[in-house]
Amino acid sequence: MGSAFVFLEASLELIPQKIRGHPAVRADAIRRGKRPEKILLDDSKHHTAMKSLEFREKRGRPDIVHQCLLLLLDSPLRDFEVYVHTLNGEIIWVNRETRLPRNYNRFVGLMEKLFEERRITAGDTTLIEFKDVGLRDIVRGRDVLLFREKGGRFEFSELLDGDVAVCIGAFPHGDFFEETLRELGEFKEVSLGTESYTSLYVTSRVLCEYERVRAHKVG
């Protein structure tokens, strides 16, 4: 089966219906020549419109998962899968051979195309696609490690030795939804320290340890 890195509740969604008529959204849509419902929600552009949204503090930050994915896909190791679980509960699979745009605006365009077509391909190869599965399905059979501020401290050599699902939040503020925690089933809460860390920092630390443990195991 192998391991998997799963970015939980990623701030990755199209403009919700509730704010599609807001002046800030309409101005952005006109500027880009796209309909509001085809545009990715982005706090830097739609901040004033987002004030009325539920769980507003967790939304509109596609840059978080963009940075984390770039880091993961740069890893020379190929023994883990990569998934994105969105704030709306959808599952995106990312081919390890995918070369994501490093430019943020190009990444946004790619994600908007993904939401519209549900799959990105190059020739006969699927690079990124929405999967018709739930979070429970992609972690099944793996030891689930949930990185969380209030988790425990463990030795990475023990944690990362088998088939694991490394679960990292990909939203700016707040905590995981109870529904997400239920979907994970049995999991171990892991903390890197007493402070609150960014998703990118957590991904970097865990990936570094994962590569160290796996390289030692192979050697």
Swiss-Prot record:
Keywords: Methyltransferase, Ribosome biogenesis, RNA-binding, rRNA processing, rRNA-binding, S-adenosyl-L-methionine, Transferase
Residues involved in S-adenosyl-L-methionine binding: F147, G169, G174, L192, G193, T194, E195, S196, Y197
A Gene Ontology molecular function term of the record: rRNA (pseudouridine) methyltransferase activity
Lineage, broadest ranks: Archaea, Methanobacteriati, Methanobacteriota, Archaeoglobi, Archaeoglobales
Oligomer and partners: Homodimer.
Annotated site, Stabilizes Arg-61, chain positions: D63
Cysteines paired by S-S bonds: none
Classification via Gene3D superfamilies: 3.40.1280.10
Marked site positions, Interaction with substrate rRNA: R61, R99, R102, R106
Similarity field: Belongs to the class IV-like SAM-binding methyltransferase superfamily. RNA methyltransferase NEP1 family.
Reaction(s) catalysed by this chain's protein: a pseudouridine in rRNA + S-adenosyl-L-methionine = an N(1)-methylpseudouridine in rRNA + S-adenosyl-L-homocysteine + H(+)
Function: Methyltransferase involved in ribosomal biogenesis. Specifically catalyzes the N1-methylation of the pseudouridine corresponding to position 914 in M.jannaschii 16S rRNA.
A GO BP entry: rRNA base methylation
Protein's UniProt name: Ribosomal RNA small subunit methyltransferase Nep1
InterPro entries in alphabetical order: Alpha/beta_knot_MTases, Rbsml_bgen_MeTrfase_EMG1/NEP1, Ribosome_NEP1_arc, tRNA_m1G_MTases_N
Alphabetized Pfam families for the sequence: EMG1
Top EC group: transferase
Taxonomic superkingdom: Archaea
UniProt entry tagged with the keyword Transferase: yes
EC number(s) from the headed UniProt entry: 2.1.1.-
